[in-house]
């Protein structure tokens, strides 16, 4: 299992557009990928799950992936987070 922690720096947090980009990035991989926030974990391939967390600016989140392509999945999601100015 691979894990990576992020601090959300985007002023609007993870709203509809960035959530869609994260789900699209995660959906390219076979691994199980989850987003954890405030003790709740959701499937990062589910737009409704991601939106239900209500992740705002300043939040600390953890992305975890488990499967054959877990390292590639975490790398791609990290790239998406940074490229979109979502997290550091």
Swiss-Prot record:
Pfam families: PTS-HPr. Phosphorylation on Ser-46 inhibits the phosphoryl transfer from enzyme I to HPr. The active site is at residue 15. The keyword Cytoplasm applies. Residues 1-88 form the HPr domain. It comes from the Bacteria. The modification Phosphoserine is found at residue 46. One of its GO terms (biological process) is phosphoenolpyruvate-dependent sugar phosphotransferase system. Its main location: cytoplasm. InterPro entries: HPr, HPr-like, HPr-like_sf, PTS_HPr_His_P_site, PTS_HPr_Ser_P_site. Keywords: Cytoplasm, Phosphoprotein, Phosphotransferase system, Sugar transport, Transcription, Transcription regulation, Transport. SUPFAM superfamilies: HPr-like. One of its GO terms (cellular component) is cytoplasm. It is found in: Cytoplasm. General (non sugar-specific) component of the phosphoenolpyruvate-dependent sugar phosphotransferase system (sugar PTS). This major carbohydrate active-transport system catalyzes the phosphorylation of incoming sugar substrates concomitantly with their translocation across the cell membrane. The phosphoryl group from phosphoenolpyruvate (PEP) is transferred to the phosphoryl carrier protein HPr by enzyme I. Phospho-HPr then transfers it to the PTS EIIA domain. P-Ser-HPr interacts with the catabolite control protein A (CcpA), forming a complex that binds to DNA at the catabolite response elements cre, operator sites preceding a large number of catabolite-regulated genes. Thus, P-Ser-HPr is a corepressor in carbon catabolite repression (CCR), a mechanism that allows bacteria to coordinate and optimize the utilization of available carbon sources. P-Ser-HPr also plays a role in inducer exclusion, in which it probably interacts with several non-PTS permeases and inhibits their transport activity. Belongs to the HPr family. NCBIfam families: PRK13780.1, PTS_HPr_family. This is Phosphocarrier protein HPr. It comes from Lacticaseibacillus casei (Lactobacillus casei).
